[in-house]
């Protein structure tokens, strides 16, 4: 009979007499029977959708279900279940050898092999008393495990305050998975006099706590908090410790302040043994219409430089109510970057936003309405000079106002109008030209003729520019203007065929292209150059009208660009497996418009541009670009890169770059090799591990090699380098990484980063994760925050 009763309940058949008795004894918490006549047909009652958290108001209305070998008791008073006893209500399930439920007090008592599953959190022990609705009670000699972190431990006693808060006495905690053999001890263990956990706030607080790792314990902490999930919480973060060749021993003790769900701040008191104390603060905010972040570092006295040091980095983004202004969109951005001195970028290379030598400060207001768009912007720079390699500061733009109009397919025509007014400010002596104002307009009209296999696009452009100068030019003029027309004709064809290479079927294309451009010569030698530079010679610029970027130089052109591209496309997925291209310019007349201190372009044939991109399988990728000079019969620029990525946590990338010197008399050009990798060393002895999912590694006991080397073949020296190892101990990860960064032609900074991460708990040391992510292509952290698992993944 007992087995039949349990089977009947599991098959959800009409209740047997024993089950009816149990429901009667739990009448206050039972489901109501249908009020229907005896002859009414049976119907299925809808089951509410499964929810992660049951609202508090519904907990007292939920039915209770019991199961066991023997059930006895008195109606409306108590129920006693013996043998394989279980009690289920909502997200609470209790299993025990003997279970007593007292209905007036809503109190459950369990004895013998007791197990509670409360929303996925599991508690096991010999004795329990618990009020079901409020989840108040105690559990003696308990073993527990939390769903969110997978962490757990043992306790002499746990007092349940409510469904979220519990207090464990003489407790331990670890995220190490318990092994089933005598004498097992976790790799790391937190022991505490009391351990208070709050699963709603996802935080644990331990008092009189010790942390042990591999049998070595720390001194006791009066109080220690740790996360029970990925949610943010205020408190001290684990300290970071590093060794730097310039700064010495580097210790940071950050404090995180969770101000609100949409605001937080982190304080970084940082002590460098060779420099002194640095105070850092980072603030972030997120609102419905605006967001931003700011970082401020302040060092009262730098012992090495014997002066005050500081750095500021801010970013703000704002969206306005565009409709009230009659616009489609209206937004603003503000970026502010400033440091105390020119040496800041070399001395503090760990602050990525402030390690550039050109620090931009700009504010912009952007708008759009229909075919119109525009912006009002101010832009200025702080230029950090370095005596061995000085740089010419760019002009500040105070202000820059742009307006653009784009109309597509207007009776078959495409029309655009781009306008720009800029007031340029700089040092006239250093720049060797006067400050001034420039008004620029570019009108463009094209008529595309398109078919599935061909395109022909004739286009005319008109460039107009007007200048006003604060000081006269070399010819005495205080103003100047320029008008330049341009005609271009872009054309191409696309052929397709079925092909087979190396036993694999493809759809192959052949795409010849011809691009002609004519721009008459206009003397621009006396005009200042505020923002123009030569375009890089690549596949993105070879089919463009102007040889220069910016608006101060419009190249005279009478040239034809010829090229052809072929692609191999997988017919099933549509993925591009390979692409090959070649292009060359044929110049019919000299290009006489040049930048200052450069000569006219007289070559009738340009260098040949060749490119290839191969993605034959998802594991392999090769990308090559070659600029070949047919007159000298040698390459003037080469870039070859390859990547091998056969699976998770396995990635090798290599690149070779060559750039010929601009002067023929100079020695060999600039050559460099760049290699990066992440690879499990266990592969060397045949241990391939297992894929546990994104951000979970490949199992414990595995070593990983990580690194990047950027080596200059010309200078025969390492430019930048990262070398390190990671060890995944399943519930802990160890990292040691050596980083070298060049801060000048003959100077470099080196630091060693050690980190010990207790998975799901805390990390000690200096984290190299940002360094590895920035330097290694497709680097995968061994652990990443993931969404908390559903309580139904651990459902009883």
Show where each model-derived region lies.
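Short, intrinsically disordered, low-complexity terminal/loop segments
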Residues: 1-3, 73, 792-796
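N-terminal acidic, proline/glycine-rich, low-complexity intrinsically disordered segments
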Residues: 1-5, 31-35
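Bacterial N-terminal signal peptides that target proteins for export
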Residues: 2-18
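Extracellular and secretory-pathway beta-repeat/beta-biased strand scaffolds
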Residues: 4, 37-43, 242, 252, ...
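Bacterial N-terminal signal peptides
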Residues: 15-27
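An N-terminal domain-start capping segment
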Residues: 28, 116, 240-241
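N-terminal amphipathic/hydrophobic interface segments
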Residues: 33-170, 189-208, 267, 420
